[in-house]
Amino acid sequence: MSLALYTCLFWLCTSGLWTTQAVTDEDSSSHRDLAPTNVDFAFNLYKRLVALNSDKNTLISPVSISMALAMLSLSTRGSTQYLENLGFNMSKMSEAEIHQGFQYLNSLLQQSDTGLEMNMGNVMFLLQNLKLKDSFLADTKHYYESEALTIPSKDWTKAGEQINNHVKNKTQGKIEHVVSDLDSSATLILINYIFLKGIWKLPFSPENTREEDFYVNETSTVKVPMMVQSGNISYFRDSAIPCQMVQMNYVGNGTTFIILPDQGQMDTVVAALNRDTIDRWGKLMIPRQMNLYIPKFSMSDTYDLQDVLADVGIKDLFTNQSDFADTTKDTPLTLTVLHKAMLQLDEGNVLPAATNGPPVHLPSESFTLKYNRPFIFLAFDKYTWSSLMMSQVMNPA
């Protein structure tokens, strides 16, 4: 199965929802030439993780993972074959153009949107006296702003503390913990991390947030802070796929699809997720007057990508089939890649609570939609159509 590294970036090349953004001459650069042969990489990966954790919260950032994998192609002697296996047509695009595209994309995502608080990056930790070649270090720094830090200690506890402290500093304290009980035979540990929090275009008022029941399953109920909003909100009820949803925009380029499967239909809805489904939903959204209840929560997850990428067709990086001879000076390179994602969903209001006015009056005759059972949260950047976050929320408490 041919998989594309670049997740959802070029969905705007299709009709409807994906063609809302104008393209300037400056923007028509190499990052737009990253059009994948299979833009369903994000959903393939998400579905695999959900299958492995069907009764648990699942959270990943496909675009962040994509950048990490593209960066690692710089380390392999057979990089052309590696990139072709990931879905790139190397007869139409050079390796340099691919990396230049990711370089520009990274700049767009991290600098052009004031409505998203996002910290995203890659950092390589070198163990067991591993020394990387200057050319590889220069390329990863230039294209991906990646750092390489040496861990001199063979004490795994101290090594884990160094990794955690570095990521905590890079995310301004948002991500405090990445690894625990670190015991790895790897000589290079790549940490791919992202923190995301958005400001809603139509914010919730903290004055209206209240404690409500959330039904985790048939036997388990938890109390969660439930945000409340009343107004015209983009809504769609799917007659073909058993779910209903709202689309809510962040200030700036961010947008979200918050999907509520019918009772017991989570697996059916997850199986139906793909580019065409999201495109169809976007076209069919209509404003509806409603009382909307969504849990306020903070979620984080950590994955060893070796465990999941092999299941979606990418495994050679973690085996002796990858030739890293052009990357290291002496010590053989063995690789571990960890993905850490954190999502914060709150009222998203830039104003102090005291200035938000009195609690909203919820009209009794309005339609009420409560996300009080497991749901799906998808966040995209509308300008690049990058898949920022994908989450299955089984228990927001």
From Swiss-Prot:
Residues the record marks as carrying a glycan: N89, N169, N217, N232, N253, N320
SUPFAM superfamilies on file: Serpins (SSF56574)
CDD domains: serpinA6_CBG
Cellular component GO terms held in the UniProt record: extracellular space
UniProt cross-references to InterPro entries, sorted A to Z: Serpin_CS, Serpin_dom, Serpin_fam, Serpin_sf, Serpin_sf_1, Serpin_sf_2
PROSITE patterns: SERPIN
Listed GO biological process terms: glucocorticoid metabolic process
Pfam families to which the protein is assigned, alphabetical: Serpin (PF00079)
Location relative to the cell: Secreted
Record site: Conserved cysteine within steroid binding domain: C243
Domain notes: Proteolytic cleavage leads to an important conformation change. This reduces the affinity for steroids.
Entries under PANTHER family matching the protein: CORTICOSTEROID-BINDING GLOBULIN, SERINE PROTEASE INHIBITOR, SERPIN
Function statement: Major transport protein for glucocorticoids and progestins in the blood of almost all vertebrate species.
Protein name as catalogued: Corticosteroid-binding globulin
Organism: Mus musculus (Mouse)
Gene this protein is translated from: Serpina6
